[in-house]
Each structure stands twice: as structure tokens, then as C-alpha cells.
Amino acid sequence: MQPTRQTPSATAAISGGGGASAGAIETDALVIGAGPVGLFQVFQLGLQDLRCHVVDVLSQPGGQCAELYPAKPIYDIPALPVCSGTELVERLLQQVAPFDPVLHLGQEVESLAPRADGRFDIGTSAGTQFIARAVFIAAGVGAFSPRRLKLPGLDTLAASCVSHQAPDVSACQGQTVLVHGGDDRALDWACRLAEHGVAVSLLYRRDVYPAAPEQVRRLELLASQGRVTRRVGQPTQARADAAGQLTGVDHLDPSGQTHHEPATRLFVSLGLSPRLGPLSSWGLQMERKLLDVEPSRFETSLPGVYAVGDINSYPGKLKLIVCGFHEATLAAWAAAHRLRPDAPHHLEYTTSSARLQRLLGVLPRGAE
């Protein structure tokens, strides 16, 4: 069972405001960022019996791991001598599944404001509204936005023809797809489409790709089987029919010759640009674009709002995934104490605690 995922089209558009809108989603905790640290934050909150919704601007969970190095090996995760970014994210999604978090993907948190009752109003770029008892900012180095392709003819195309996000394989069936880019994301998109029987070409300015060796070998195998067509060159013009539907892309090869590549769908991966975004306007104390936190609780200058992972700053800070896991653990404990000040808080172990094992689904509810 995987966490529930909602795209902007699947979430209700609620008008903003500080009141308790009938359509606002009420939750124990809202986690901003679905990277490894954000996902582990969900797990630690689940152990405190605090339920979560998660918002991320990217179209898939995983943050930098999924977008920047999905196939590159990671060697410093405890008990995993080596794993890829994709594998790490998949394992974390499996780990949080017992707590049924809802992932709101492809939207950015735009507003955060404290309420008189101690909770927080949060609004996203998709119009989704939340009322949360605690907020956890796990935004990494900021919200990632894809670098946009600027190409003559592109702005006249129907919106469905061009995307800077990962392709939906099922929606690409029967289409002729051109992927532009040479990084891990571009190669993964082209390979995944080809592996599902989609006619796909890959266009990059060089015949050497700045991608993980595993991805390059995967591409080369598919190309040798005639399942991916590789082109070298720079795109110069998007072509469309009278209805604004993409018909192909002209490109200039290294010798200066112009070629036309037929395509009905264009997917662009030119890298991602992190930006701080609206976070800087929320009134939180910052230094050099990082959130100041108290390192025993990882609480920001606004009580009830916590920051974990690469977005925070404190003496001795190390920007490592494993350090973010530690921060998420202490932040979850701090939030539980704040939200339930009169409840006993004892350190429990998942190996022996029946309560934790019930939360994890290892024991049925009501079992001793």
C-alpha cells in the first residue's frame, strides 16, 4: 500500500482566508517537502500518532534524490551499503505507508499564517487550503522549478503538447514522443517510455550524456534494439498544425545541418533551479536564506513551525540525509510534547512497544 497522491486537479480549490473554511483540510501536521527528510518526518510523526498531509512542488515524491540523481549510488545511509536515489525514496514510501499520509504533488505552499487557536492556515498554488496543528518545513534548498525551454513556435502549441515534468506513460501511448535533454531525468524518461512501447526519440546537444553510467547503459541497450532514436543537436523551431498540435521539432546538428524530428509530444529536461519562493515572506527568522532553528527541537522562530534538512541552520549543521533523519526525529518529539503537554511522553522502542507496533500495523488494533 502506497501513500495517497493528489495532483492539483484532484484537490479541491478553496478560497483563502483565516476562517475555518468548510473545504479546508484539517490535519495534525503539514509537511512541506516530499524529499527523503520530509518522508522520514512523516514516519516519525506517525510514531507519535500524528497524521500528516505532505505538499511538494514536484510531480513525484523524492525531492533532489528523485529529480537530480535517481540512478546515482548513495553510500552513507545506515544499513544500506549502497542504494540509488530512486530506491531510497521507494523504501521511505514503503516505510510511511502504515500511516496513510496524503501527498499533494505539483503544487507549492504559498501562504502560512498562525491562527488565534494556535493552529496554522496554509494555502497552496493549486488553491488547496489546510488547517494544521503543526508545520514541518523540509524544503531542501528550496522549491525546484524546471528550467524552461525557449524555442520559436513553442508558445503557440496546445498546453498538452509540451511538458517540463515527467511523462505519464499511459497518456503517451500512441503518441510520437521527443525528449529533450541529457541528464538522468531525460534518459530515465526516454527509457521508461521506450520500455512501455512508446515511440520515443532523445535529443541532446552532445553524444555524451551527463548522466549516471547505469542510465547511459540502459539507453544504449534500448537504442541498440531500435526502441529509442538518439539525435544530436540543438532545437531551433517547434512546428505545429493549424490546430496548434505539435508536429515536430527542427534541430541543428554539430555540422550546422538542420533536421526535422517528427513528434506529437515534447518533454523537456534542462535541469532544475532551486528558489526560496514564498517561504521568505512568512515572517520566519532566516540567515543567508536558511531558517534558524533551536537544535534540540528544530523549531523555527514561530512556535509550532519546525524546519528539518537542508533548509535549516544551526551551529554544527551538516547537510547530509542521515542528519536530516535525526532532525526529523527530534522535531516530531518536540511537536508531540507541544501538542499534548499533559500526556506522558516515554521513550519507546519499535522492537518491544505494542503501541508502536499497532501504529505500524505489525499488531492489530486492540492487541496487547
Swiss-Prot record:
E.C. code: 1.18.1.2
Cofactor requirements of the protein: FAD
Ligand binding (FAD): 56, 64, 69, 109, 144, 310, 351
Gene Ontology MF terms in the entry: ferredoxin-NADP+ reductase activity; flavin adenine dinucleotide binding; NADP binding
Keyword list, A-Z: FAD, Flavoprotein, NADP, Oxidoreductase
Known catalytic reactions: 2 reduced [2Fe-2S]-[ferredoxin] + NADP(+) + H(+) = 2 oxidized [2Fe-2S]-[ferredoxin] + NADPH
A Pfam cross-reference name: Pyr_redox_3
Note on how the cofactor is bound: Binds 1 FAD per subunit.
Top-level EC class: oxidoreductase
Assembly, per entry: Homodimer.
Entry similarity comment: Belongs to the ferredoxin--NADP reductase type 2 family.
PANTHER family per record: THIOREDOXIN REDUCTASE 1-RELATED-RELATED (PTHR48105)
Protein name: Ferredoxin--NADP reductase
Organism, as annotated: Leptothrix cholodnii (strain ATCC 51168 / LMG 8142 / SP-6)
